[in-house]
Amino acid sequence: MMIRIGFGYDVHPLVEGRKLIIGGVEIPFTKGLLGHSDADVLYHAIADAFLGSLALGDIGQLFPDNDERYRGIDSGLLLQEVYRRVRERGYCLNNLDAVIVAQKPKLLPFIQKMRENLAVLLNTAIENISVKATTTEGLGFAGREEGIAAYAVITVKEVLENG
């Protein structure tokens, strides 16, 4: 059985007047992430990790930010399309490990719901999904509360027809 690994990273600036959506969860906060879509930084990092695992380019190539079809789109739909392409090539998720980097807000109360959302979107057991959050102890753009970043590492495994 062939196993492949993918790594993804995404970052968006925090701005006033936008909802903060991470991992498909709307999080109460005074600012939200700026982006062409709903700017779900976690879903974007995971999508790039999937694409990287099979050398399929990146999320910006598939869903360009100058294409009006994707303005304000739910990033869960983008992630589902990316995963459909992974499945179409004979692979499925083995496991996912992701980290969200944000000084504020505190994300721990929302992590379980993010994991549940991902398990449903990716049609997998929640045990295959790890999502964590950390701060930068006040350092850098995240520490200054200028933006939020996410990193994701995934492994995909070849789907065997007879086994």
From Swiss-Prot:
Q: What does the record give as EC number?
A: 4.6.1.12
Cofactor(s) listed: a divalent metal cation
The UniProt keywords, alphabetically, are: Isoprene biosynthesis, Lyase, Metal-binding
* GO BP annotation list: isopentenyl diphosphate biosynthetic process, methylerythritol 4-phosphate pathway; terpenoid biosynthetic process
Residues that coordinate or bind 4-CDP-2-C-methyl-D-erythritol 2-phosphate:
10-12, 36-37, 58-60, 63-67, 134-137, 141, 144
What does the record give as the reaction this protein catalyses?
4-CDP-2-C-methyl-D-erythritol 2-phosphate = 2-C-methyl-D-erythritol 2,4-cyclic diphosphate + CMP
- UniProt binding sites for a divalent metal cation: 10, 12, 44
Residues carrying the site annotation Transition state stabilizer = 36, 135
Q: Name one GO molecular function term.
A: 2-C-methyl-D-erythritol 2,4-cyclodiphosphate synthase activity
What InterPro entries is this protein classified in?
A: MECDP_synthase, MECDP_synthase_CS, MECDP_synthase_sf
Q: Does the keyword Aminoacyl-tRNA synthetase apply?
A: no
Pathway, per UniProt? Isoprenoid biosynthesis; isopentenyl diphosphate biosynthesis via DXP pathway; isopentenyl diphosphate from 1-deoxy-D-xylulose 5-phosphate: step 4/6
Cite the cofactor comment.
Answer: Binds 1 divalent metal cation per subunit.
NCBIfam families for the chain: ispF
> Which family is this sequence assigned to?
Belongs to the IspF family.
* Role description: Involved in the biosynthesis of isopentenyl diphosphate (IPP) and dimethylallyl diphosphate (DMAPP), two major building blocks of isoprenoid compounds. Catalyzes the conversion of 4-diphosphocytidyl-2-C-methyl-D-erythritol 2-phosphate (CDP-ME2P) to 2-C-methyl-D-erythritol 2,4-cyclodiphosphate (ME-CPP) with a corresponding release of cytidine 5-monophosphate (CMP).
Q: How does it assemble?
A: Homotrimer.
The entry's protein name is 2-C-methyl-D-erythritol 2,4-cyclodiphosphate synthase
Organism per entry = Carboxydothermus hydrogenoformans (strain ATCC BAA-161 / DSM 6008 / Z-2901)
